[in-house]
Amino acid sequence: MLPLTAAITAGGASSRFGSDKALALWQGRPLLDQVAAGLAACERRLLIAPPGKYALPGWETWPDTRPGEGPLAGLEVALTHAAPGWVAFTGVDNPALTSDYWLTLLAACRPGMSSVQALHPERGPQPLGALYHTALLPRVTGLLAAGERRLRLTAPAEQTVLVTGLGAHFFQNVNRPADLAELSGRGEESLEV
């Protein structure tokens, strides 16, 4: 088991997708199941979603306490209910994040750091699909109370470890049906670290 709490946020409206993207199929399985499979080895697993909306055996479901306020609000719920330590946090629209991806981030954890994020070769740090320490909870709550919604502000830069060398294919975010079609065209062989 990985010494992490896994957390998937699945409370968005899927407005750009046109239907519930958590249930959209990729490689014959719903996106939610694909994302959960990459995090299956985590000691504790949290699904941030409306109660009763999804069935994910072995996962605790917690409602988004600030619906409509984005992934930062989902992270607040995850940090609140996680075991003390590191949380592997991602969205339902990141199905290419394998267990090897999470192991790579976990190996980069350092004392005194509060986040571990993959560094996209072109777009920089990736705050969704990252590790966050539960010590960040007061900061996240403060950001939300101040009206902030940007996940990238969660951890101070000097407390963030950036992991290089991960392929760009890990960062395919499924927001539209065309994104899912593009991801499907890549196949499984491109999803290794």
From Swiss-Prot:
One of its GO terms (molecular function) is molybdenum cofactor guanylyltransferase activity. It comes from the Bacteria. Mg(2+) binds at D93. Its main location: cytoplasm. It is an enzyme of class 2 (transferase). It is found in: Cytoplasm. Its cofactor is Mg(2+). It catalyses: Mo-molybdopterin + GTP + H(+) = Mo-molybdopterin guanine dinucleotide + diphosphate. GTP binds at T9, A10, G11, K21, D64, D93. Pfam families: NTP_transf_3. Transmembrane segments: none annotated. Keywords: Cytoplasm, GTP-binding, Magnesium, Metal-binding, Molybdenum cofactor biosynthesis, Nucleotide-binding, Transferase. One of its GO terms (cellular component) is cytoplasm. PANTHER family: MOLYBDENUM COFACTOR GUANYLYLTRANSFERASE. The N-terminal domain determines nucleotide recognition and specific binding, while the C-terminal domain determines the specific binding to the target protein. Belongs to the MobA family. Transfers a GMP moiety from GTP to Mo-molybdopterin (Mo-MPT) cofactor (Moco or molybdenum cofactor) to form Mo-molybdopterin guanine dinucleotide (Mo-MGD) cofactor. This is Probable molybdenum cofactor guanylyltransferase. It comes from Deinococcus radiodurans (strain ATCC 13939 / DSM 20539 / JCM 16871 / CCUG 27074 / LMG 4051 / NBRC 15346 / NCIMB 9279 / VKM B-1422 / R1).
